[in-house]
């Protein structure tokens, strides 16, 4: 685990974005941890979040021309990541996002920001069922652009309804790489460093044993 990944886990814990306990997911599964990126909700949070996304992007080595944030949660992520890339990595890249409702006045259309073209890096909070990615792919393809990759904050590394995860389905269906700031594996490595969190470690490992990929 790299220093920025450990720092991200501590940031998420401090903001109660990442919590341990017993939580019922939308799928009905009982999970020993929960991640709610919506709680990154202040200016400072967004500034830090952008730095972690930018760090993961640079670390990945993936090449891309533009950041795309799917409405709604992806919009502030794309914006703050673009700022962090410019400020901390000297990479001044364009970004854009979509509207859920097409505008019928002014410049019209359903895209805001730079023209959607070239190799697109899609940024979002998490991938649950992959629905937002599929909707975004339609927009990207309709504009003649290509998907360079997807970056999310956390990869839960667990099976969906089939034997593979929603992330693996996206990688298979769109022939692209999905990267994340942290994975479940990183979370377990972090818990292993904290003797006071042994109870949570056992629960998370048991969950991975049952649902992991």
UniProtKB/Swiss-Prot annotation:
Annotated Gene3D superfamilies: 3.40.50.2020
GO MF terms, alphabetically ordered: magnesium ion binding; orotate phosphoribosyltransferase activity
Keywords annotated in UniProt: Glycosyltransferase, Magnesium, Pyrimidine biosynthesis, Transferase
CDD domains: PRTases_typeI
Enzymatic reactions: orotidine 5'-phosphate + diphosphate = orotate + 5-phospho-alpha-D-ribose 1-diphosphate
Binding site for 5-phospho-alpha-D-ribose 1-diphosphate: 26, 72-73, 99-100, 103, 105, 124-132
Keyword Magnesium: yes
Domain of life the protein comes from: Bacteria
Record-level GO BP terms: 'de novo' pyrimidine nucleobase biosynthetic process; 'de novo' UMP biosynthetic process; pyrimidine ribonucleoside biosynthetic process
Enzyme Commission number(s) from the entry: 2.4.2.10
Biological pathway: Pyrimidine metabolism; UMP biosynthesis via de novo pathway; UMP from orotate: step 1/2
Record-listed orotate binding positions: 34-35, 128, 156
Entry GO terms, CC: cytoplasm
Entry keyword annotation includes Glycosyltransferase: yes
Record-stated family: Belongs to the purine/pyrimidine phosphoribosyltransferase family. PyrE subfamily.
HAMAP family linked to this entry: PyrE (MF_01208)
Function field: Catalyzes the transfer of a ribosyl phosphate group from 5-phosphoribose 1-diphosphate to orotate, leading to the formation of orotidine monophosphate (OMP).
PANTHER family per the UniProt record, alphabetical: OROTATE PHOSPHORIBOSYLTRANSFERASE 1-RELATED
Subunit description: Homodimer.
Protein name, entry field: Orotate phosphoribosyltransferase
Native organism: Escherichia coli O139:H28 (strain E24377A / ETEC)
């Amino acid at each position: 685990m790299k220093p920025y990944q450990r720092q991200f886990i501590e940031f998420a814990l401090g903001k109660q974005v990442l919590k341990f306990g017993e939580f019922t997911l939308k799928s009905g599964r009982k999970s020993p941890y929960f991640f709610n990126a919506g709680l990154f909700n202040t200016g400072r949070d967004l500034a830090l979040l952008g730095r972690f996304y930018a760090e993961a992007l640079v670390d990945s080595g993936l090449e891309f021309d533009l950041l795309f944030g799917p409405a709604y949660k992806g919009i502030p992520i794309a914006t703050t990541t673009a700022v962090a890339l410019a400020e901390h990595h000297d990479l001044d890249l364009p970004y854009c996002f979509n509207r859920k409702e097409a505008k019928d006045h002014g410049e019209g259309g359903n895209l805001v920001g730079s023209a959607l073209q070239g190799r697109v890096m899609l940024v979002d909070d998490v991938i649950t069922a992959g629905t937002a990615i599929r909707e975004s792919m339609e927009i990207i393809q309709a504009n003649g652009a290509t998907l360079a990759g997807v970056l999310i904050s956390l990869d839960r590394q667990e099976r969906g309804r089939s034997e593979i995860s929603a992330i693996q389905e996206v990688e298979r269906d769109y022939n692209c790489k999905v990267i994340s700031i942290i994975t479940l594996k990183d979370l377990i490595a972090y818990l292993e460093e904290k003797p006071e969190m042994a109870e949570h470690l056992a629960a998370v490992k048991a969950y991975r044993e049952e649902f992991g990929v």
